[in-house]
Curated annotation (Swiss-Prot):
Protein name: Small ribosomal subunit protein uS3c
Tree of life domain: Eukaryota
Ranges in coiled-coil conformation: none
Positions of the KH type-2 domain: 39-120
Molecular function via GO: rRNA binding; structural constituent of ribosome
């Protein structure tokens, strides 16, 4: 029976890096993890509340770098309309920064640096592509059309290969059995440790139940 490993953890230290960068004593390590979770959860909730549409302001990842007196948070986004640094200058970013310091007590005694970076090719990121697929499936678009469109979007981002997998009752018919459908184009060398493969696993709730979505991009 095949044993599946997370492609990101498998390549950690070679082609992948940590999203949290800090050091703690062993007794304080769990507290540091909880702090990171609270920061990410607060940012996600703020953007979900303030976003303009379901396709805008999609977060790829949140990087946290903590030192003794400074907490640096970098938000990597695609199609950012909310957290823009244009006009008015950094208003929403400042609002988020203030609400983050108020909500999370351990940041209050440290300096908080918050930055937003827009991705040049958003659909080359599996997290953003996975959320796009989830939105399309929620709007009852055919899963085959969604997978083909996802492949086209990745090709425009000049990637070497993509694999998309959707699992669940995806046909849209009553009393249908759950199944797995996948589509691959190009090279996706999952067994090669030095291959820089990005991965995302997410799910979406539809009228037919929960669908699981996995995206590999090389």
């Amino acid at each position: 029976m095949g044993q599946k490993i997370n492609p990101l953890g498998f390549r950690l230290g070679t082609t992948q890096t940590h999203h949290s960068i800090w050091f703690e004593k062993r007794k304080d390590y769990s507290e540091g993890l909880q702090e990171d979770h609270k920061i990410r959860e607060h940012i996600q909730n703020y953007i979900e509340k303030e976003r303009i549409s379901s396709d805008s302001d999609v977060i790829s990842r949140i990087q946290i770098d903590k030192s003794i007196d400074v907490v640096k948070v970098i938000i990597y986004m695609g199609f950012s309309q909310l957290l823009t640094e244009d006009e008015p200058p950094k208003t929403k970013i400042k609002e988020l920064q203030v609400s983050l310091k108020k909500a999370i007590h351990f940041i209050q005694n440290r300096k908080l640096n918050l930055a937003v970076r827009k991705m040049k090719k958003p659909y080359g990121d599996p997290t953003i592509l996975g959320k796009y697929i989830a939105n399309q499936l929620k709007n009852r678009v055919s899963f085959r059309k969604v997978m083909k469109k996802a492949v086209e979007l990745v090709e425009k981002a000049y990637k070497k290969g993509i694999q998309v997998q959707i699992a669940g009752c995806i046909g849209g018919k009553a009393q249908e059995m759950a199944r797995v459908e996948w589509l691959r184009k190009g090279r996706v060398p999952l067994q090669t440790v030095t291959a820089k493969i990005d991965f995302c696993s997410t799910q979406v709730i539809t009228i037919r139940g929960v669908l699981g979505i996995k995206v590999w991009i090389f």
